[in-house]
A protein has these predicted regions:
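Extracytoplasmic gate region of multi-pass secondary transporters
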Residues: 32-36, 151, 155, 230-275
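Central cavity-lining transmembrane alpha-helices of secondary-active solute carriers
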Residues: 52-70, 272-279
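C-terminal membrane-cytosol helix-exit motif in multi-pass small-molecule transporters
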Residues: 158-167, 188-211
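Juxtamembrane intracellular "pre-TM" segments in multi-pass secondary transporters
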Residues: 1-9, 206-234
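C-terminal ends and interior cores of transmembrane alpha-helices
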Residues: 86-100
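Glycine-rich segments within core transmembrane alpha-helices of 12-TM secondary carriers
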Residues: 138-166
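Cytoplasmic helix-loop-helix junction between adjacent transmembrane helices
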Residues: 108-146
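Extracytoplasmic
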Residues: 13-45, 68, 154, 248-253
């Protein structure tokens, strides 16, 4: 294999990691962030109920982060990433039916498993493999910057789809019409997530598939050893603090609707711009 073909293959792997790294959270997070007023209305939720859904997701995700790393040491990242995208997309089909609050709680717990346990450790491992021994910083900077670009692009497409399927002016639409338009946004998002998993399964080919599996007990002992390092806990605090600040921006579209009295489409555009500013 020539050096040029290896370089192209490596670049393709990075692009696929960037796509999957953001699209995996499109259904559980990005839609609620961009379309917050519409989201609450079509699912008949209040802010407390939406927060409880995220809490269910967070509890499952917290456990998944710990044990997901063990799974990523045992199986090829390519397969884990693809499977997690497939399962997450299947949840989107249920999401599009506007299920009851109880089913939504189960669904968000399910997404906490599919987007973290099967995915996160595998994505981090695949990114480290791409970066090699000398380009770890470059690899993760490309990953995070690229994810921001994907979020901005997908939120713009989502707003466009929502506006396209609104048959009349937003002020004149009924709840059922807004639900139908938003259903297309959910189904499109589910399709994109599934299709990305399909591409990754067949196109992401590299040395990650030849990595030998690690004994589970060895991985768990390494986790325990790592948790004894003080700097690891400081990094945890930094990351949590950064995400707390980041999550505050989720209410911008709702603020635009309830305080500035923007309509649902204008509020969604505020949410879209918020994703763009994350770049």
């Amino acid at each position: 294999m020539t050096h040029q073909s290896i370089k192209k293959k490596s670049f393709l792997n990075l692009v696929l990691l960037i796509l999957s790294g953001e699209l995996i959270f499109l259904l559980p997070y990005v839609l609620a962030r961009v379309f917050r007023p519409t989201f609450l209305e079509v699912f008949d939720l209040n802010n407390f109920e939406l927060g409880s859904l995220f809490s269910v997701y967070g509890i499952v995700a917290l456990l998944s982060y710990v044990y997901g790393g063990v799974i990523s040491d045992k199986y090829p990242p390519r397969k884990l990433i693809a499977i997690s995208l497939f399962f997450t997309a299947f949840g989107g089909v249920v999401f599009a039916t506007y299920p009851s609050f109880l089913v939504l709680q189960i669904l968000y717990g399910y997404w906490g498993f599919t987007t973290v346990f099967l995915f996160w450790g595998a994505m981090i491992k695949a990114t480290r493999i791409w970066g090699g021994t000398n380009s770890q910083g470059q690899a993760f900077s490309f990953l995070d910057g690229g994810r921001g670009l994907v979020a901005a692009s997908m939120s713009s497409i989502g707003v466009l789809i929502f506006s396209f399927f609104l048959v009349t002016e937003i002020e004149l639409t009924t709840l059922s019409q807004r639900k139908e338009a938003f259903r297309y946004v959910i189904l499109f998002s589910s399709f994109i997530v599934f299709f990305t998993g399909f591409i990754i399964l067949f196109l992401m080919k590299n040395k990650e598939d030849t990595v030998q599996t690690t004994n589970n007990f060895s991985s768990i002992s390494q986790i325990k050893k790592t948790l004894k390092i003080p700097s690891v806990w400081l990094i945890m605090i930094i990351i949590v603090s950064a995400y707390v600040g980041y999550k505050v921006t989720d209410i911008y579209s709702l603020y635009a609707s309830e305080v500035m009295l923007f309509d649902d489409l204008e509020s969604a555009n505020i949410g879209r711009c918020n994703c763009t500013l994350d770049l």
